[in-house]
Amino acid sequence: MDKQNQIGDFLKFLGPQIGQEIHVGPWLEIDQQRINQFAEVTGDQQWIHIDPERAAKESPYGTTVAHGYLTLSLLPYLTQSNHPDFFQKNYPGMKYRVNYGLNRVRFPSPVKVGSKIRARTTIQTAEEVKNGVQICYIITVDIESEEKPACSVEFLARLYP
């Protein structure tokens, strides 16, 4: 089958899923070790992230909180989007996916140390682009037992046959 037909078939496959939640990921506990490792790697050593004693006294949250970008960096795990089973199920006929970008990244609520987070993924749009398909996902990262999410983002991915 030629690439143009593969693209057309893939768009037909995606059509009924537009606007649908396609995945709810596993809960992941955010511990202080993970926060500290992220701080070390990124150089973001702000006390609100890495100093539990000071955060307990001075932070409005009463504890340390994860970096917003830590939450964002966990999207591949939280969405399971790079797992071979996820790829095979959700991208039939496609060989590879590349991250194209992010829109509307927001961090409505902090992730306190010890909190559990998970991601919900919804397909917003799918359209043909040169030699492939671009999908815009809405990803919402929930915090267990919290009303407001930790993060919401439009994630753009491009897939190619």
Per-region residue spans from a language model:
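A beta-strand/beta-hairpin structural motif
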Residues: 100-104
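HotDog/MaoC-like acyl-thioester-processing domains
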Residues: 1-17, 107-161
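Generic structural detector for well-ordered beta-strands
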Residues: 23, 27-29, 106, 156-158
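Hot-dog-fold acyl-thioester-processing enzymes
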Residues: 2-98
